From Swiss-Prot:
PANTHER family, sorted: DNA GYRASE INHIBITOR YACG
Taxonomic lineage from the root: Bacteria, Pseudomonadati, Pseudomonadota, Gammaproteobacteria, Alteromonadales
Protein name: DNA gyrase inhibitor YacG
Function: Inhibits all the catalytic activities of DNA gyrase by preventing its interaction with DNA. Acts by binding directly to the C-terminal domain of GyrB, which probably disrupts DNA binding by the gyrase.
Keyword field: Metal-binding, Zinc
Pfam family, one: YacG
Gene Ontology BP term (one): regulation of DNA-templated transcription
Binding sites annotated in the UniProt record for Zn(2+): 7, 10, 26, 30
Co-factor binding comment: Binds 1 zinc ion.
Oligomeric and partner information: Interacts with GyrB.
Membership in a protein family: Belongs to the DNA gyrase inhibitor YacG family.
InterPro entries in the record: DNA_gyrase_inhibitor_YacG (IPR005584), Znf_NHR/GATA (IPR013088)
Length: 76
């Protein structure tokens, strides 16, 4: 049974599958409307941005270890 979601823009039903290339949006139009909302800063992420002070030393070391495993051209 396919998963059905509501288009974030127009609320119409969208099947979450490869046959819906703009998922979770129902169309390219709704996808672009949403992009415009973000570009005009009408949408925001509700959680506060985490400051570096909120990271423990262990977390920082874990992130650095993961980054060290990437190829040298990862950030280019």
């Amino acid at each position: 049974m396919p998963t059905i979601v509501n288009c974030p823009t127009c609320k119409s039903k969208v099947e979450w599958s490869e046959q819906s290339p703009h998922r979770p949006f129902c169309s390219k139009r709704c996808q672009l409307i949403d992009l415009g909302e973000w570009s005009f800063e009408n949408n925001r992420i509700s959680a506060p941005i985490t400051s570096a002070e909120d990271f423990s030393q262990d977390m920082i070391e874990d992130i650095e270890a993961m980054m060290a495993k990437n190829e040298d051209d990862f950030f280019k």
